[in-house]
Amino acid sequence: APWTYVPTGFWYNADLVGEGKKYSLPTTWEEFFALGDKAKKDGIALFTYPTAGYFDTSMYQMLAQAGGMEFYNKAVNYDPSTWTSKEGKEVVDTIAKLASKDYTWSDTVANANADGGFKKNQQAVIDGKALFMPNGNWVIGEMAASTPKDFHWAMMAQQKFSADQKTYVYTYTEQIWIPKDAANIDLAKQFIKFMYSDKVVELMLANKSVNKETKEETPAPIISPVKGASDKLEAGPVKDSYTLTSASGTEAVAGVWATTKPINGFDMKATVYGAIDSLNTGELTAAQYQKQLEEAWTKLLENLDR
């Protein structure tokens, strides 16, 4: 059962991007890359990412955005045509273009593979070196110590492939599990029920993060998947990110890759996400990446834990 959820998207500086700001907010990938070309002339990169693993939520969203929920559900269950389809190729080509040196901040890959370097990539958005990055609202508390008081975060839904599409927002969820052989299953069920109570909703909303060095506390609300919970948030970027999921013409996406049996020598994270670093460095082409994903899906389908 889900006990918390976080909408994800592209985070940015609301004082730099948006209505009436230096850069307009793009809604399609075509507009997004055009913005990148404009920002590049100003010495600003379009994009950065904390680590390649942060492409998980981006890829889930892109699959739904490209082909709708039926295509998405087939893809996360390793449908063999996922990456040879028009929609799958569109996702691969977009990721390859986004991760290229033309649009991704020059220090991204080096930082992403250094201890603690993910924060340097996140800082690049704060410092105006890059416009957007994939993330969730936890980034606000994570970067609180190095964020200027007058900086304003915002999150946008990832871009659409065409203007007439509905907008998809991927929602990251965390789950509570009861082992099937648990000694106190009935008690565990009561605890899960308690997790949806008003008391827990309020406790989660009041959560704070503490800076290890300064001991300074920063609000870090955790949102329960209870109707109306996000409405209790204070006005600001966190509440705005939840409002996105219920906006007209928007559909929330959840779920993860289907579970498989252990596959000897196969690293899902490195194959699907780690390879994106290689798209940036030129060690891997979009066509090679597509082939790699196609072969991975064949292997994963064969080992699907049915």
Tell me what each language-model feature is:
Residues 36-38, 79-113:
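Glycine-centered hinge/linker elements that transmit conformational signals in sensory
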Residues 1-24, 33, 44, 50-77, ...:
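Periplasmic solute-binding protein
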Residues 43-46, 121, 126-135, 151:
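Alpha-to-beta junction loops
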Residues 24, 67-91, 97, 145-148, ...:
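Short, solvent-exposed loop/beta-turn-alpha elements that line the ligand-binding surface or hinge
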Residues 87-94, 174, 183-195, 203, ...:
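Short amphipathic alpha-helical coupling segments at ligand-binding clamshell hinges
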Residues 145-216:
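Extracytoplasmic/periplasmic substrate-recognition and gating elements
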Residues 236-299:
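C-terminal capping/gating helix-and-loop segments adjacent to ligand/active sites or protein-protein/ligand interfaces
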Residues 27-33, 108-126:
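Short helix-initiation/N-cap motifs at beta->coil->alpha
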